[in-house]
Amino acid sequence: MKTPSSLDFLTEALRRLPGVGPKSAQRMAYHLMQHDRDGAAMLGRALSQAVEKVQHCAMCNTFTEHEVCETCLDAERNPALLCVVETPGDQLMIEQTLTFKGLYFVLMGRLSPLDGIGPKDIHLEKLISRATDGIVQEVVLATNFTNEGEATAHYISETLKARGLKVSRLARGVPVGGELEYVDAGTIARAMLDRRTT
């Protein structure tokens, strides 16, 4: 059976989503066309609107519909604290903890020389400019604890320390509610090394 080209195009478009392979994309496309055409139309409108309206904040590089995002404009925030994250999703997770009251800088990625991603690709010059504006007192590195995230944190830390800035890193350890029996040895080791007095 020859599939309609429009359906093939939809399937290929859905494959661009992370974690969606050819079979999942095909199932989604067929579901939308067979059971939820209104949902498909809404999805199309939402994607078009987001692509048209969402841009990067001129100050922190996160997603916004304005030149400067609401977080950067919030007078209640401490401009002396700058938290560096890899993605807007990481920023959202930190915001949901209600523990950080400073400002952010979103890298939109992480260093990965094997993938050809260098300092320019993660907006390092923009970060340095922001961090050395005379207002920022401390930069909190909240990159992920992957090899690339660690390399990114190290590179940024060395770069900013050389300019006289105080740089800190998120602590690592046992998750809240986690039982040691189910935590991997690397996490327990890091928690032991990063322990603090109470």
UniProtKB/Swiss-Prot annotation:
PROSITE patterns in UniProt: TOPRIM
Membrane-spanning parts: none
Domain of life: Bacteria
Cross-referenced SMART domains: TOPRIM (SM00493)
GO BP annotations listed: DNA recombination; DNA repair
Keyword field: DNA damage, DNA recombination, DNA repair, Metal-binding, Zinc, Zinc-finger
InterPro entries according to UniProt: DNA_Rcmb_RecR (IPR000093), Rcmb_RecR (IPR023627), Rcmb_RecR_Znf (IPR015967), TOPRIM_dom (IPR006171), TOPRIM_RecR (IPR034137)
GO MF annotations in UniProt: DNA binding; zinc ion binding
Zn finger residue spans: C4-type: 57-72
Toprim domain ranges (all copies): 80-175
Annotated family: Belongs to the RecR family.
PANTHER family assigned to the protein according to its UniProt record, in alphabetical order: RECOMBINATION PROTEIN RECR (PTHR30446:SF0)
Role according to the record: May play a role in DNA repair. It seems to be involved in an RecBC-independent recombinational process of DNA repair. It may act with RecF and RecO.
Protein name (Swiss-Prot/TrEMBL): Recombination protein RecR
Organism ancestry: Bacteria, Pseudomonadati, Pseudomonadota, Betaproteobacteria, Burkholderiales
